[in-house]
Amino acid sequence: MIRELEYYGSPTLRRKAEAILEITDEIRQLAQDMYETMVAHKGVGLAAPQVGESVSLFVMCVEGETEDGDLIFCDFPKVYINPVLSNVSEDLVLGREGCLSIPGLRADVYRPRSITVKAINLDGQEFTEHLEGFPARIVMHENDHLNGILYIDKMEEPKDYKKFKSALEKIRRRYNNHITDKAS
């Protein structure tokens, strides 16, 4: 099922997600719904807070990059439950980022070149991955969502910052009727 997205201005996007203690049918369905929502909106990753669920889970559909920089997409979504990042590279790389919760805007963000992520899959199995390049950027971006952080909090200031801030305010106003606060 495609779920409604939370947009910039939603309190859910600024809340630290809660750890998932048990993988239930509801969690499995949430992951499936998130994947369908991500694909429907042409995303490459999606965190649970972006669909109004403040739990520590995100999905991603990129496995890597070719030498030419083309993305290699997964046959099945990767699900990360209660992710923990480590071995964060000191080498920072500037890259453009966007977000389904901030439609139409992109900005440059410095992120580490590589990371290691340890998480749990839908079968309850712990796994560890070392990621570099764009897949690492996606994991860091989605993991930030689980901590109430948006890419705009880390972006390099755009050349026309006033215009960017104005666009953010338009997003907040436009999607205000979609804002939910499920913790209230």
From Swiss-Prot:
Coiled coil: none annotated. Its EC number is 3.5.1.88. Its cofactor is Fe(2+). InterPro entries: Peptide_deformylase, Peptide_deformylase_sf. Fe cation binds at C99, H141, H145. The keyword Iron applies. It catalyses: N-terminal N-formyl-L-methionyl-[peptide] + H2O = N-terminal L-methionyl-[peptide] + formate. Keywords: Hydrolase, Iron, Metal-binding, Protein biosynthesis. The active site is at E142. Binds 1 Fe(2+) ion. One of its GO terms (molecular function) is metal ion binding. The keyword Iron applies. GO terms for biological process: co-translational protein modification; translation. Removes the formyl group from the N-terminal Met of newly synthesized proteins. Requires at least a dipeptide for an efficient rate of reaction. N-terminal L-methionine is a prerequisite for activity but the enzyme has broad specificity at other positions. Belongs to the polypeptide deformylase family. NCBIfam families: pept_deformyl, PRK00150.1-3. This is Peptide deformylase. It comes from Chlamydia abortus (strain DSM 27085 / S26/3). The lineage of its organism: Bacteria, Pseudomonadati, Chlamydiota, Chlamydiia, Chlamydiales.
